Amino acid sequence: MALGTWGASPDEVSASLPGDELCPDARLVATRSITISAPARDVFPWIRQMGFGRAGWYSYDWIDNLGRKSARSIIPEWQNVEVGDAIPGGPIDFEAAIVDAPNVFVMRLGGTGRLSRRIRFVLAYVLRETDEGTRLVTRVRARVDLPLGGMIERLFLGPGDGIMLRKQLITLKTRAERF
């Protein structure tokens, strides 16, 4: 799937990334990347402040932030997300699983209910300094253990996440390069 590897090099697609171990039996794995002309220390705060009702998701705001515009600046009070903290996702919550500023931010689907045990979703943001600035590599790993879970992953989760994350990466690039 083209959206599953959007912008990523073959080496990035095959590389092990932080967070892979949090969903080792994933059926959906997608690696997407973008080069940002800014140092990682200037990109990471945009990622750290993400969340519904916070900075937003920098994607299609009318879908994932109920029309509220994603932040256009760094918000200091949203820079304190640490491992174990909740990241509001709207109807669902994520949890910060790995935070290693300014290089790694990994979130996973949070919660302890029956549904959260049957749906596993991990999203990693890995920032690597390059001569051009920062290479931002993302990896989604997911598994839906529900009836028709494989079909849900293939037909809805994979394409939907691909469209949204591609837009997010482009917006992150624009924001980080502008500030």
PLM features: residue spans?
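Hydrophobic ligand-binding cavity/cleft-lining segments
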Residues: 1-78, 177-178
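Beta-strand/loop substructures that line and gate deep hydrophobic ligand-binding cavities in soluble
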Residues: 13, 112-174
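Short Gly/Pro-enriched turn/cap motifs at secondary-structure boundaries
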Residues: 23-25, 84-87, 115-117
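Short, surface-exposed coil-to-beta transition loops
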Residues: 29-31, 90-92, 118-124
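A short, structured loop/turn motif at beta-sheet edges
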Residues: 37-41, 97-103, 126-135, 173-179
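Generic secondary-structure microfeatures
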Residues: 40, 47-51, 67, 98-103, ...
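Secreted/surface-exposed cysteine- and glycine-rich disulfide frameworks
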Residues: 66-92, 99
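Short beta-strand segments that buttress and anchor functional surface loops
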Residues: 81-84, 106-114
